[in-house]
Amino acid sequence: MPSIVIPAYNEANGIERCLRALLVDAVDNPVDNPVDNLMDNLVIVVVANACKDDTAARARAFGNGVIVIETEQGGKTNAVNLGERTLRARGLDLYPRLFLDGDIELLPGSLPAMLAAAQAGESPRIVAARPRFDASRSSLPVRLFYQGEAFNPYHRSGAPNGSGTFMVNAAGRARWDEFPAILADDSFVERRFAPSERATVAGATAIVRVPRTFTALRRISARKRLGAYELDKVAPPRADDRGSAGTFGVVARAMLPNPLHWPAFVLWAAVKSVERFESRAAARKQGTDRWQHDTTSRT
């Protein structure tokens, strides 16, 4: 019996799309699927944290099938912890468990595919949907950046992988206690698993709506780098994990043979370089406890 935890901060423009995709998948799940009776067994909790909009009301409109919790305290990891505590308190500490960002839309068939992959054996396992970046409403520089980012091997294997989704079985969730108050929650979880225990599910796709403006892209990119610096202090990288080493070379070898990719590669490389500088500046200016939020992709 699966459970889903969705932290949501001012997601009024995306939470309905997120929930509708989950429930449509549940209703349409065929009876001969290995994950039978999905709708009857699915438990969803949405944690609306520090919201100034009607995220909670829109989630409640889906009825009793969605548990909605509200908290005035902001922070994604706090919201996730509150959601998991709520499940335990209600006797619904069920697995596999999907952690899903409130602005992510899973394509049909993705949820059953992830459940089947997460339940393939009793050993610890973490899986994620494959991200599909939607830059259709973004500026040209943002679109060029994501043309390059599509070649980043991080998004094509393992879990988490930048899709705003990851699912663990019970043995996998036992690898850590509560989520620490850090920015890079997904990388924290990733480091709890060996590379052989992490997988991107080929039959699952998550629509990731990217920033619309180049300014927003730079800010979010710096935030991610800032989170990585912070994480290294509390949870060093695994010895058996290559991490981001070699990413530049992989992307360069994939893009440079085709002259049509050159503008995208130049912009992608520039953003990756600048984000290092801006993340250090952000750390000096405001610390690492702020959940920066891209509003441009949510309108």
For every predicted segment, state its role.
Residues 11-26:
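Short, well-formed alpha-helical segments that are part of the catalytic scaffolds
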Residues 13-17, 53-61, 109:
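Acidic helix N-cap motif at the loop->helix transition within catalytic regions
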Residues 56-90:
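Conserved donor nucleotide-binding strand/loop of the catalytic core
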Residues 92-105:
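Short beta-strand-to-loop acidic/aromatic patch adjacent to the donor-nucleotide binding site
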Residues 108-140:
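Conserved donor NDP-sugar-binding/catalytic core segment of glycosyltransferases
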Residues 118, 133-136, 180-242:
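Catalytic donor/gating beta->alpha subdomain of glycosyltransferases that bind UDP-sugars
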Residues 210-211, 219-299:
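Terminal low-complexity segments of carbohydrate-biosynthetic enzymes
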